């Protein structure tokens, strides 16, 4: 079992080898790249990311994934906007990172590796709505705001409506959603309805 300092806890994990790099996304839309060889070994107590990165005041890391130069990634914010970015455009050489997604008043939500052009995106909002769309419908940008993935107007955003989850689905995968004591299955052949 891992032990944490007071106020700390588990956030996420990512499978990355020591000769690879990790891409991190902060909630303010900035991305950072860390060489795994620079991280302390698992035998110690670790080291705060803030000692290796220059995070802006009040921002926090919300997503991490293996960085590959030839890879493609889906990045999204909780206002429902997102786009596809190439691995080359995601790479940051500096401790201060680079601006990736223009969030405005929103917060960055997700950074996930796209495995195939056939992958689909499942987007969920905090009102319980679900939408499935082909990932290839998103624009490929180096940075910016992107397109609307799930509809959230400025008025709805001001009232608290947010996209709170985004999941990349392989082409023929079934989906099982749970909410409290209810569950809903979406079979691959039924995805067109969503």
Model-identified regions with their sequence ranges:
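Short, structured "edge-of-domain" segments at secondary-structure transitions
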Residues: 1-194
